C-alpha cells in the first residue's frame, strides 16, 4: 500500500498582548484600548526572545494599539509587516468597559455560576447581557 503525502499543516501561535494600564488597575477593557505599561513592553520583548527561532510566514494582530504594539515588538527582527484586523479584537464587554473588574465579577457572579451548569453548546452561546459578546460571537468573528 502506498503512503499518501502528509497534508501541509499550519501551526498557529496565539500571543496575548502585554500588560496595559487598565490591566494593572483591574479595569474591564474588552474592545476599549489602553497603552502597554513598561512591564507590558518588557513582556512583549520576552515573548519575542522566546519566539526568535521560530519562522513565521505572517503576523496578525487586532487593530487595537496594545495588540499592535505587542506584535510590532515581536516582529522587530523579522522582515514581516503586521497585518491588522478589527475581527481579531477581544470580546466586547459593552457598557462594562472602563469599569472595575471586581464590580463586573460581583455583579455577574450568579451568571458565572449558571454557565458552569450549562452544556458546552449552551455555554458558548450564553450572553451575560445583550451588549456583551458570547463566546460563539467572538469565535464567529475570528473564523
Write out the residue ranges for each language-model feature:
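Phosphate-handling substructures
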Residues: 78-141
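Hydrophobic alpha-helical membrane-association signature
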Residues: 43, 141-142
Amino acid at each position: 500500500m502506498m503512503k499518501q503525502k502528509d497534508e501541509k499543516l499550519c501551526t498557529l501561535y496565539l500571543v496575548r498582548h502585554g500588560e496595559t494600564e487598565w490591566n494593572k488597575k483591574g479595569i474591564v477593557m474588552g474592545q476599549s484600548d489602553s497603552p502597554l505599561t513598561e512591564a507590558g513592553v518588557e513582556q512583549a520583548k520576552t515573548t519575542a526572545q522566546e519566539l526568535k527561532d521560530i519562522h513565521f510566514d505572517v503576523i496578525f494582530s487586532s487593530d487595537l494599539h496594545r495588540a499592535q504594539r505587542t506584535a510590532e515588538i515581536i516582529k522587530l527582527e523579522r522582515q514581516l509587516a503586521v497585518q491588522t484586523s478589527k475581527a481579531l479584537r477581544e470580546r466586547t464587554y459593552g457598557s462594562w468597559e472602563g469599569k472595575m473588574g471586581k464590580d463586573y465579577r460581583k455583579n455577574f457572579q450568579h451568571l458565572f455560576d449558571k454557565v458552569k451548569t450549562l452544556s458546552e453548546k449552551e455555554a458558548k452561546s450564553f450572553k451575560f447581557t445583550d451588549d456583551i459578546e458570547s463566546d460563539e460571537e467572538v469565535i464567529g468573528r475570528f473564523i
